[in-house]
Protein backbone atom coordinates (compact mmCIF):
# COMPACT_ATOMS: atom_id res chain seq x y z
CA UNK A 1 0.00 0.00 0.00
CA UNK A 2 1.43 3.36 -1.00
CA UNK A 3 -0.58 5.49 1.45
CA UNK A 4 -2.60 4.50 4.48
CA UNK A 5 -4.58 6.75 6.78
CA UNK A 6 -5.73 5.02 9.94
CA UNK A 7 -8.21 6.39 12.48
CA UNK A 8 -7.42 10.03 11.70
CA UNK A 9 -8.90 12.71 13.93
CA UNK A 10 -8.48 16.41 13.18
CA UNK A 11 -10.25 19.56 14.28
CA UNK A 12 -9.51 23.26 13.99
CA UNK A 13 -11.26 23.76 17.34
CA UNK A 14 -13.11 21.54 19.86
CA UNK A 15 -16.48 22.32 18.24
CA UNK A 16 -15.23 21.89 14.65
CA UNK A 17 -14.31 18.25 14.00
CA UNK A 18 -13.35 17.83 10.36
CA UNK A 19 -12.20 14.22 10.60
CA UNK A 20 -13.32 11.63 13.09
CA UNK A 21 -11.93 8.12 12.71
CA UNK A 22 -11.14 8.73 9.01
CA UNK A 23 -9.52 5.88 7.04
CA UNK A 24 -8.16 5.74 3.50
CA UNK A 25 -5.90 3.46 1.47
CA UNK A 26 -4.27 4.47 -1.80
CA UNK A 27 -2.66 1.81 -3.97
CA UNK A 28 0.23 2.56 -6.29
CA UNK A 29 -0.91 3.95 -9.64
CA UNK A 30 -4.49 4.67 -8.53
CA UNK A 31 -6.40 7.94 -8.82
CA UNK A 32 -8.77 9.00 -6.05
CA UNK A 33 -10.98 12.08 -6.21
CA UNK A 34 -12.04 13.80 -3.00
CA UNK A 35 -15.48 15.35 -3.35
CA UNK A 36 -17.41 17.61 -1.03
CA UNK A 37 -18.66 21.11 -0.54
CA UNK A 38 -16.41 24.07 0.15
CA UNK A 39 -14.98 23.98 3.66
CA UNK A 40 -15.55 20.27 4.25
CA UNK A 41 -11.83 19.52 4.71
CA UNK A 42 -10.47 18.40 1.33
CA UNK A 43 -7.55 20.86 1.39
CA UNK A 44 -6.96 20.15 5.07
CA UNK A 45 -6.69 16.42 4.33
CA UNK A 46 -4.10 17.03 1.60
CA UNK A 47 -2.14 19.28 3.98
CA UNK A 48 -2.24 16.57 6.67
CA UNK A 49 -1.01 13.94 4.20
CA UNK A 50 1.84 16.20 3.08
CA UNK A 51 2.85 16.91 6.68
CA UNK A 52 1.90 20.59 6.80
CA UNK A 53 -0.52 20.03 9.71
CA UNK A 54 -0.49 17.86 12.83
CA UNK A 55 -3.37 15.45 13.31
CA UNK A 56 -5.07 15.17 16.70
CA UNK A 57 -4.97 11.36 16.58
CA UNK A 58 -4.37 8.55 14.13
CA UNK A 59 -1.61 7.88 11.66
CA UNK A 60 -0.67 8.63 8.09
CA UNK A 61 1.72 6.10 6.56
CA UNK A 62 3.46 6.73 3.22
CA UNK A 63 5.63 3.96 1.75
CA UNK A 64 5.74 2.31 5.16
CA UNK A 65 6.92 5.47 6.97
CA UNK A 66 4.81 7.68 9.24
CA UNK A 67 4.13 11.21 7.99
CA UNK A 68 4.70 13.62 10.84
CA UNK A 69 3.36 17.14 11.12
CA UNK A 70 5.33 20.30 11.91
CA UNK A 71 5.53 19.59 15.67
CA UNK A 72 7.79 16.61 14.95
CA UNK A 73 9.13 17.27 11.44
CA UNK A 74 10.46 20.71 10.53
CA UNK A 75 10.59 20.10 6.77
CA UNK A 76 7.28 18.82 5.35
CA UNK A 77 6.92 16.44 2.46
CA UNK A 78 8.63 13.33 1.18
CA UNK A 79 10.88 12.79 -1.83
CA UNK A 80 8.26 10.66 -3.59
CA UNK A 81 5.29 12.93 -2.79
CA UNK A 82 4.39 16.35 -4.22
CA UNK A 83 1.59 18.74 -3.30
CA UNK A 84 0.21 21.33 -5.69
CA UNK A 85 -1.61 23.73 -3.39
CA UNK A 86 -3.95 26.54 -4.34
CA UNK A 87 -1.06 29.02 -4.13
CA UNK A 88 1.28 28.06 -6.93
CA UNK A 89 4.65 29.14 -5.47
CA UNK A 90 6.23 29.87 -8.85
CA UNK A 91 9.51 31.72 -9.36
CA UNK A 92 8.29 35.03 -10.87
CA UNK A 93 11.55 35.98 -12.64
CA UNK A 94 12.20 32.57 -14.18
CA UNK A 95 10.51 31.43 -17.38
CA UNK A 96 7.78 28.82 -17.47
CA UNK A 97 10.35 26.26 -18.71
CA UNK A 98 12.77 27.17 -15.90
CA UNK A 99 9.99 26.80 -13.33
CA UNK A 100 9.05 23.37 -14.67
CA UNK A 101 12.70 22.27 -14.82
CA UNK A 102 13.59 23.58 -11.36
CA UNK A 103 13.92 20.10 -9.80
CA UNK A 104 15.27 18.25 -12.86
CA UNK A 105 18.99 17.46 -12.86
CA UNK A 106 21.31 19.57 -15.04
CA UNK A 107 23.69 16.67 -15.71
CA UNK A 108 22.08 15.93 -19.08
CA UNK A 109 20.73 19.23 -20.39
CA UNK A 110 19.23 17.70 -23.53
CA UNK A 111 17.28 15.15 -21.47
CA UNK A 112 16.15 17.95 -19.14
CA UNK A 113 14.95 20.02 -22.10
CA UNK A 114 13.01 17.03 -23.48
CA UNK A 115 11.41 16.32 -20.10
CA UNK A 116 10.35 19.96 -19.68
CA UNK A 117 8.85 19.93 -23.19
CA UNK A 118 7.00 16.67 -22.44
CA UNK A 119 5.51 18.14 -19.26
CA UNK A 120 4.56 21.41 -20.94
CA UNK A 121 2.71 19.34 -23.54
CA UNK A 122 0.88 17.41 -20.80
CA UNK A 123 -0.43 20.67 -19.32
CA UNK A 124 -0.96 22.36 -22.70
CA UNK A 125 1.58 25.16 -22.27
CA UNK A 126 4.28 24.28 -24.81
CA UNK A 127 3.97 27.69 -26.53
CA UNK A 128 4.56 29.51 -23.21
CA UNK A 129 7.98 28.02 -22.36
CA UNK A 130 9.87 31.32 -22.60
CA UNK A 131 7.24 33.50 -20.85
CA UNK A 132 7.53 34.69 -17.23
CA UNK A 133 4.75 33.33 -14.97
CA UNK A 134 3.69 36.82 -13.90
CA UNK A 135 2.32 37.32 -17.43
CA UNK A 136 0.18 34.17 -17.26
CA UNK A 137 -3.41 33.82 -16.14
CA UNK A 138 -4.21 32.05 -12.87
CA UNK A 139 -5.18 28.89 -14.75
CA UNK A 140 -1.93 28.90 -16.71
CA UNK A 141 0.09 29.39 -13.52
CA UNK A 142 -1.82 26.49 -12.02
CA UNK A 143 -0.77 24.28 -14.93
CA UNK A 144 2.89 25.33 -14.60
CA UNK A 145 2.76 24.27 -10.96
CA UNK A 146 1.31 20.86 -11.91
CA UNK A 147 4.04 20.34 -14.53
CA UNK A 148 6.74 21.26 -11.99
CA UNK A 149 5.35 18.76 -9.48
CA UNK A 150 5.33 16.03 -12.15
CA UNK A 151 8.95 16.81 -13.08
CA UNK A 152 10.29 14.80 -10.14
CA UNK A 153 8.13 11.77 -11.00
CA UNK A 154 6.52 11.45 -7.56
CA UNK A 155 4.90 8.20 -6.49
CA UNK A 156 2.02 10.28 -5.07
CA UNK A 157 0.75 13.59 -6.42
CA UNK A 158 -1.64 15.62 -4.26
CA UNK A 159 -3.64 18.19 -6.23
CA UNK A 160 -5.72 20.76 -4.38
CA UNK A 161 -8.46 21.96 -6.75
CA UNK A 162 -6.14 21.87 -9.77
CA UNK A 163 -8.79 22.88 -12.28
CA UNK A 164 -10.43 25.69 -10.31
CA UNK A 165 -9.03 28.49 -12.50
CA UNK A 166 -9.70 26.83 -15.85
CA UNK A 167 -12.63 27.25 -18.19
CA UNK A 168 -14.75 24.19 -18.88
CA UNK A 169 -13.13 23.04 -22.15
CA UNK A 170 -9.57 23.49 -20.78
CA UNK A 171 -10.57 21.65 -17.63
CA UNK A 172 -11.73 18.59 -19.58
CA UNK A 173 -8.68 18.63 -21.86
CA UNK A 174 -6.19 18.96 -18.98
CA UNK A 175 -7.94 16.32 -16.90
CA UNK A 176 -7.74 13.82 -19.79
CA UNK A 177 -4.05 14.56 -20.48
CA UNK A 178 -3.11 14.51 -16.81
CA UNK A 179 -4.97 11.28 -16.00
CA UNK A 180 -3.44 9.56 -19.04
CA UNK A 181 0.07 10.74 -18.07
CA UNK A 182 -0.13 9.63 -14.43
CA UNK A 183 -1.54 6.26 -15.51
CA UNK A 184 1.32 5.76 -18.01
CA UNK A 185 3.89 6.69 -15.35
CA UNK A 186 2.15 4.72 -12.56
CA UNK A 187 1.78 7.83 -10.38
CA UNK A 188 -0.92 7.76 -7.71
CA UNK A 189 -3.13 10.82 -7.71
CA UNK A 190 -5.20 12.23 -4.87
CA UNK A 191 -7.23 15.14 -6.18
CA UNK A 192 -9.69 17.47 -4.48
Identify the function of each model-found stretch.
Residues 151-155:
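A short, proline-enriched helix->beta-strand linker immediately N-terminal to the Walker B motif
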Residues 157-161:
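Catalytic Walker B motif of ABC-type/P-loop ATPase nucleotide-binding domains
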Residues 58-69:
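Conserved ABC transporter NBD signature motif
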Residues 50:
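Helix-to-loop junction immediately C-terminal to a conserved catalytic motif
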Residues 110-128, 179-180:
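Conserved ABC ATPase "signature" region
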Residues 132-136, 140:
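Conserved ABC ATPase signature
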Residues 67-82, 106:
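ABC ATPase NBD coupling module
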Amino acid sequence: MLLEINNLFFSHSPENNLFRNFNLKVEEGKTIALAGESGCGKSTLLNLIYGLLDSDEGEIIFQGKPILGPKKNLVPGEDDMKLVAQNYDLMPYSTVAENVGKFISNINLEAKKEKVQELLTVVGLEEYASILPKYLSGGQQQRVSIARALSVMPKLLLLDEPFSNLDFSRKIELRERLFRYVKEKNISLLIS
